């Protein structure tokens, strides 16, 4: 039976001393849910898994319920197939990630049903500091490192729409 590779992005773990989960425990949690070849990456909740299941909605429900029960917090995840991730990388705007000495780059992954078009309505950019671009499945955000403290990206964290987003940085060429 063919297996599918997925990237699972957890929201709000190991941030600000809340929802602390060791990566070995997180890996064991995914394995207990029946996923194979589980690999965690850094402490912010990036997990690669394999599954024979192709129903993303069912997988999201399974993962959120399983993690919520095992780790006693309301788990929220963004699930991205290998094909979708390749599309997100390919759809990045020209030059995105090309000058990591001058700019900080972030990809804002969206939890369905939030669309990039709708998410962009909540994203403010500060002229001369920030740039934002809506792709097909994610938002791409860059800001000048020298002026990062005046960036508007942090404003999104206080908005209700942020509950359906997760931001990952270091997305470079």
Outline where the language-model segments fall.
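Surface-exposed, charge/polar-rich loops and edge strands
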Residues: 2-44, 48-173
């Amino acid at each position: 039976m063919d297996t599918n590779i997925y990237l699972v992005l957890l929201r709000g773990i190991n941030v600000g001393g809340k929802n602390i989960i060791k990566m070995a425990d997180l890996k064991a949690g995914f394995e207990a849910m029946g996923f194979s070849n589980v690999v965690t990456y850094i402490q912010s909740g990036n997990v690669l898994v394999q599954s024979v299941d192709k129903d993303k909605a069912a997988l999201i429900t399974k993962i959120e319920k399983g993690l919520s029960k095992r780790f006693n917090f309301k788990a929220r995840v963004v699930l991205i197939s290998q094909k979708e991730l390749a599309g997100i990388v390919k759809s990045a705007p020209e030059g995105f990630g090309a000058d990591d000495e001058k700019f900080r780059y972030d990809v804002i992954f969206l939890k369905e049903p939030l669309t990039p078009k709708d998410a962009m309505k909540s994203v403010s950019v500060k002229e001369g500091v920030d740039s934002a671009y809506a792709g097909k499945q994610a938002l791409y955000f860059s800001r000048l490192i020298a002026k990062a403290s005046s960036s508007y990206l942090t404003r999104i964290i206080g908005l209700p729409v942020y509950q359906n987003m997760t931001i990952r940085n270091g997305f470079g060429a």
